[in-house]
Amino acid sequence: MKLITNKQGLVGAITVPGDKSMSHRSIMFGAIAEGKTVIRHFLRADDCLGTIKAFKALGVKIEETEEEIIVHGTGFDGLKQADGPLDIGNSGTTIRLMMGILAGRDFDTVILGDESIAKRPMNRVMLPLQQMGAKMHGKDGSEFAPITINGKQSLKRMEYHMPVASAQVKSAIIFAALQAEGETIIHEKEKTRDHTEHMIRQFGGEIEMDGLTIRVKGGQTFTGQEMTVPGDVSSAAFFIVAGLITPGSEIELTHVGLNPTRTGIFDVVEQMGGSLVVKDSSRSTGKLAGTVVVKTSDLKGTEIGGDIIPRLIDEIPVIALLATQAEGTTIIKDAAELKVKETNRIDAVATELNKMGADITPTEDGLIIRGKTPLHAANVTSYGDHRIGMMLQIAALLVEEGDVELERAEAVSVSYPTFFEDIRSLLK
C-alpha cells in the first residue's frame, strides 16, 4: 500500500476509536454478569470482534447494532462448551484472559490463533493458573498455542508475586480467582493498566487495591451495566506524535481515555518539550476521559525507563519515531517485553525506521535513537503488527520526495480500521 506523504500539517479534530483493552473486557464482564450489558463506542476492530465471536461460541447471546453492543450475560456458570476450538485470531488479550475465565469451567476448551499468536509465550499465564489447580497445556506439551484447557477442576486461592509486569497475566489470574475458593492475593512487580480491577467494581463486584497488592475473593457475581468506552489512548498516540512532528499541525482528539496507568506518553511528551494540553476532562462511566490538543513542537531527547514503561509499552514504537525528530539522543530501556508482542517490536522499529534514514540502535531491552534525522522514501513492512504499520504511516508524513510502500498494511485493522481515513480527514 502506498502511504500518505509530504503533507504540510494536520489540522482538525477527530474522535479515536474505543479503547481496545476496555472493549475486550466489557464483553468479558458482560458475559459473566447476570442480565443485560449495553456497550457504546465499542472498538469494532478485528481483535475485539474476535472476543465477541468467542463468547458467542460459548453460548452467550450478543447483539450488534450500529450504536451498541448488547450482551445477555449468563454468569460464569452459564457458559457452555463450544462446538469446536475457539479461534481468537491475532488477539493476545483474548487468549490470555480467556485462559483465566475458562480455567474454572466444567468443560474442556481448545483456544488457537493465527501465526503470530502461535509464537507468543503462554507459560506466564499457564504457570500461575496451574498453581491454582487449573489443568492446561500448549501444543505438544509446550507453552505455545493451541492451548488445551481441561475443565472440571476446583480452583484454589493463592498468593502470587508476578515475575513480569503484565496486565494480561494479572487479569487472567483475577478472572480465575473470581472462580476460586477463598481470597487470592497478587503482588505486582510494577503497576500495570488496571481496567480489569475497575470493571469488577463497575459490575458490582469487590476487589482491594493497595499499591502493588491486589486482593480478590472468589464466588462473586456481577450485574449487567450500561457503559461508554472512552477513546483508546494507544490509538490517540499516533495522532499525538503526528501533531508534534508534522510542520504546521494542530490536532484535537476528543473523548480520549485518561486512566493514569495508560498516559505515560503524556509524561514523555512533556519531558521532550512538546505542546500537549488536556482539557474538558470528565468521568465517563467511572473512567476519566478528556480532549487532548497537540501542536507542532521543537523537541529534545530524553531517557525513558523504569516504572513508566508499563504505562506506555504499546506506544513505544511511535515514541521512537517521535525521538527521531528530537534534538539529541533518546534512550529507551527496561522494555524487553516488546520482543514478545505481535512481532519483536524492538527490532522492527529499528529496522524499518533506519530504512527511512533514522539512526536507531536496538538493545537487549530497548532502543537508542539519535536525532534529529530527516526521513526519506523506502519500502517498509508492518510485519503483520498493527502498531508498527500505523507508526510507519506517521513517519511517511515527513517524507518530501518519493513513495513509501507499506507491506501488510491490512494489519492496522486489528485495532483501528478507520486509521487511514482519519489521517486524510486532517490533511490541510
From Swiss-Prot:
Supply the Pfam families for this chain: EPSP_synthase
Question: Catalytic center at which residues?
Answer: D314
Q: Which organism is it from?
A: Listeria monocytogenes serotype 4a (strain HCC23)
Q: Name one GO biological process term.
A: aromatic amino acid family biosynthetic process
Enzyme category, top tier: transferase
Which family is this protein grouped under? Belongs to the EPSP synthase family.
Amino-acid positions noted as binding phosphoenolpyruvate in the UniProt annotation, renumbered to this chain: K20, G92, R120, Q168, R345, R387
Keyword set, alphabetical order: Amino-acid biosynthesis, Aromatic amino acid biosynthesis, Cytoplasm, Transferase
Q: Which Gene Ontology cellular-component terms appear in the entry? A: cytoplasm
* Name under which the protein is recorded: 3-phosphoshikimate 1-carboxyvinyltransferase
Q: Its domain of life?
A: Bacteria
Give the record's pathway. Answer: Metabolic intermediate biosynthesis; chorismate biosynthesis; chorismate from D-erythrose 4-phosphate and phosphoenolpyruvate: step 6/7
| Catalytic activity annotation | 3-phosphoshikimate + phosphoenolpyruvate = 5-O-(1-carboxyvinyl)-3-phosphoshikimate + phosphate
User: What is the primary gene name for this protein?
Assistant: aroA
User: Which GO MF term does the entry hold, naming one?
Assistant: 3-phosphoshikimate 1-carboxyvinyltransferase activity
What this protein is reported to do is described as: Catalyzes the transfer of the enolpyruvyl moiety of phosphoenolpyruvate (PEP) to the 5-hydroxyl of shikimate-3-phosphate (S3P) to produce enolpyruvyl shikimate-3-phosphate and inorganic phosphate.
Q: Where in the cell is it found?
A: Cytoplasm
